């Protein structure tokens, strides 16, 4: 008997429907075609054990399985459940009437338990788009998939539940989640707050500007000055995720298998902080079986690279294009995969190997050549892509011992949100542009033209610091953000002055770059 069962294959952060055709006939062999990988081919042994452990008999017949479309590689053990159901239905152990209404995915253990899978959310979205009545998946993934409305999502723990449900012997209750309530439940809660930071008012201001315009930022300063402390508090002043951004971010983490068990929707912007020993593939994604990298896992959030010069040159250079394009394209011989990479890059570094160059109290023991080699690990093109470059100095004792509360993240966030609302109105007619950091040269010429005094100041800075054309654009973008924070319609000289001050690594005292 020929039957069809439906599953899904995840490519990038989206899913494709996979049709699994099973035919049982006279014979004793097991054939599987349709570009399955080794894990899918090995499912035969798992399915036999799971089925017979639960009191059912695996057919002693010739079983032919075809997985289409044949040009899409089927990877992983998540096809165990639809394969098992298809084989039993073909052997008339399961009624085939309901099979066309449901999509099934799940990995089987030898005792028939159904184990978690990756990509439950994009699979659920695809099931709804294709008009399936419901989705049957592992119970551990059910809340993740149930955020998709207008789809019955059933979480199951073992194969017996699935067989009895499809045969009409039991009823299963679909898991229902109020997506909006789930989204708003924790999206304003933060454990870290800028009120914990003593002093460093100028650096806090730089973070406010970065958050308001979506600008990349790098902090240069000695050990213990508070670089990491402030970077970790950046998400607390960023605008909250929209529901659409939350779904997109959750899809990426779902595909990567990074969702916590029982979680549903990511309601806060991600903060990723990879170690400096990370490989280029782990950072940008890829591999034999392509997966999102850290830069994609930080999409719609913050990617923090602590001690930037300690990262390998290859890792830093491979990051340049994604920062510009806000996406990662992984090309293979027969297909290509695209992952989003819309991140705010926050980096920190010491000014020299010993850490005390330009320190007000401690003496630097590094030679000028050593300092230049250290700074030379970060290329000019990469620095050009970092809009705000801030030098940070140690906090004096008087500030550390001050018990008066500092400004909270909430009050800073209100100003950031107000500036973002101005930008949202400005770019309403420009799809794909949401904040000042994303402006093209054409938009800069329309929205960020400085006044006469500002233009003169900018010309002086370009000549003095030998800035590139890209750095020129970055200064204008930052100046436009500063003007938005002040509610100014035009870009004025004081906005240009502050923006130029955020190009510390272009200054003469950091050497010619």
Task: Give the ranges of each region predicted by the language model.
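Peripheral, non-AAA+ core regions of ATP-driven protein-machinery
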Residues: 1-218, 222-225, 331, 471-472, ...
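Short beta-strand elements
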Residues: 18-24, 283, 387-390
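Basic, amphipathic alpha-helical bundle interface domains used for macromolecular binding and assembly
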Residues: 39-44, 59, 66-76, 289-290, ...
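Residues immediately C-terminal
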Residues: 110, 303-304, 310-311
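Conserved alpha-helical scaffold flanking the Walker A/P-loop in AAA+ ATPase domains
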Residues: 208, 265, 270, 280-303, ...
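Walker A/P-loop
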Residues: 219-260
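The Walker A (P-loop) glycine that initiates the GxxxxGKT/S ATP-binding motif of P-loop NTPases
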Residues: 221, 285, 307
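Walker B catalytic acidic pair
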Residues: 300, 306-307, 318
């Amino acid at each position: 008997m020929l039957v069809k069962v439906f599953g899904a294959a995840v490519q990038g952060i989206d899913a494709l429907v996979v049709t699994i055709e099973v035919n049982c006939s006279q014979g004793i062999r097991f054939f599987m075609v349709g570009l399955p990988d080794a894990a899918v081919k090995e499912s035969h042994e798992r399915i036999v054990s799971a089925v017979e452990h639960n009191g059912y008999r695996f057919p002693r017949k010739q079983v032919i399985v075809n997985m289409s479309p044949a040009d899409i590689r089927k990877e992983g053990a998540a096809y165990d459940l639809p394969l098992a159901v298809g084989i039993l239905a073909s052997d008339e152990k399961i009624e085939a009437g309901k099979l066309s209404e449901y999509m099934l995915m799940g990995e089987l253990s030898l005792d028939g338990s159904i184990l978690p899978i990756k990509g439950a959310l994009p699979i659920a979205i695809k099931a709804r788009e294709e008009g399936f009545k419901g989705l049957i998946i592992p119970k551990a993934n059910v809340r993740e998939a149930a955020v998709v409305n207008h789809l019955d999502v059933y979480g199951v723990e073992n194969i017996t539940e699935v067989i009895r449900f499809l045969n009409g012997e039991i009823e299963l209750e679909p898991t229902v989640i109020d997506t909006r309530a789930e989204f708003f439940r924790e999206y304003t809660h933060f454990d870290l707050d800028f009120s914990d930071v003593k002093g460093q008012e100028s650096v806090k201001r730089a973070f406010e500007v970065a958050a308001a315009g979506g600008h990349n930022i790098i902090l240069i300063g000695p050990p213990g000055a508070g670089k990491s402390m402030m970077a970790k508090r950046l998400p607390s002043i960023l605008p909250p995720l929209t529901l659409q951004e939350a779904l997109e971010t959750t899809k990426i983490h779902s595909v990567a298998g990074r969702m916590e068990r029982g979680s549903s929707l990511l309601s806060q912007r991600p903060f990723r902080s990879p170690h400096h020993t990370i490989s280029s593939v782990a950072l940008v994604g890829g591999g034999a079986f392509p997966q999102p990298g850290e830069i994609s896992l930080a999409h719609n959030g913050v990617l923090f690279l602590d001690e930037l010069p300690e990262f390998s040159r290859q890792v830093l250079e491979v990051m340049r294009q994604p920062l510009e394009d806000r996406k990662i394209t992984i090309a293979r011989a027969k297909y290509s995969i695209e992952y989003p990479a819309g991140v705010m890059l926050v980096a920190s570094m010491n000014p020299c190997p010993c850490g005390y160059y330009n320190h007000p109290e401690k003496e630097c023991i590094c030679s000028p050549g050593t300092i230049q080699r250290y700074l030379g690990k970060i290329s000019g093109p990469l620095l050009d892509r970092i809009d705000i470059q801030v030098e940070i100095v140690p906090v004096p004792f008087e500030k550390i011992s001050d018990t008066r509360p500092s400004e909270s993240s909430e009050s800073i966030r209100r100003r950031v949100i107000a500036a973002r609302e101005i930008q949202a109105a400005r770019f309403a007619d420009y799809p794909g542009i949401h904040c000042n950091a994303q402006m093209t040269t054409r938009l800069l010429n329309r929205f960020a033209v400085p006044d006469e005094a500002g233009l003169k100041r900018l010309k002086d800075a370009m000549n003095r610091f030998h800035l590139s054309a890209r750095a020129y654009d970055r200064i204008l973008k930052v100046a436009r953000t500063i003007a938005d924070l002040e509610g100014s319609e035009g870009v004025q000289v004081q906005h240009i002055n502050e923006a130029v001050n955020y190009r510390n690594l272009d200054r003469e005292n950091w050497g010619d770059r």
